[in-house]
Design a protein with these regions (language model features):
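Generic structural signal for secondary-structure transition and capping sites
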Residues: 30-34, 66, 88, 133, ...
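NAD(P)-dinucleotide binding in Rossmann-like oxidoreductases
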Residues: 40-54, 60-122, 166
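A general structural signal for well-ordered alpha-helical segments in protein cores
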Residues: 21-22, 117-125, 149
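A generic structural signal for residues located within well-ordered alpha-helices
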Residues: 17-20, 116, 140, 144
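Active-site rim elements
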Residues: 11-12, 109-112, 132-136
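Predominantly a Rossmann-like dinucleotide-binding segment in NAD(P)-dependent oxidoreductases
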Residues: 1-47, 159
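C-terminal helix-rich "cap/oligomerization" subdomain common to oxidoreductases
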Residues: 126-167
Length: 167
């Protein structure tokens, strides 16, 4: 069985997979999470798997934005993103570039390739060598994401809404 299936090795679904989505959401919003309520389950238990396989969470931000995210090992739908704002809703389905704005399907002009691990490591090493800031993410961004992850894990364990502690 994979190392990922062991809590002591991977930390579970939130640190292993959830961090990427939560980091993107916080970046889009431009703010940190303030509180979170999470529900976690293992709906398909196996003796060699001791991590949750389903996580659902709701987080709030200081501006009042609600973040609602579900992570599951039991579907093959890929990514679905919806952002509801004051001027409408954007829905992005999967990696194929199907975009809806207020229910109307829009074409995405080109596929965007995200940088792989090699380019991320190269950027990090170049920034350190040149004494310049990183291009996108910072330690502060990572810390905000992990604070949300840890608070969500605690909420999942206790069944209580948790304050996200930064600092």
């Amino acid at each position: 069985q994979s190392w990922f299936a062991r809590q002591a090795l991977s930390g579970g679904i939130l640190p292993g997979i959830g961090t990427h989505s939560l980091d993107a959401i916080l970046w889009w919003l431009g703010e940190q999470a303030e509180s979170v309520y999470a529900m976690v389950q293992n709906i398909d238990p196996h003796p060699e798997v001791d991590i949750e396989d389903e996580v659902s969470l709701v987080a709030t931000t200081p501006s009042g934005a609600l973040i609602n995210v579900a992570f599951s090992f039991h579907h093959s739908l890929g990514y679905e993103w919806s952002v509801a704002g004051t001027e409408g809703t954007i829905h992005l389905s999967g990696t194929q570039g199907v975009l809806k704005l207020n229910g109307e399907v829009r074409e995405v002009p080109e596929r965007v390739e995200l940088p792989g691990e090699d380019s991320i490591q190269h950027e990090f090493l170049s920034a350190v060598a040149e004494g310049r800031p990183l291009a996108q993410a910072s330690g502060r961004d990572t810390r905000a994401t992990m604070a949300l992850v840890f608070a969500a894990q605690e909420s999942g364990r206790t069944g209580q809404k948790m304050e996200v502690v930064h600092g």
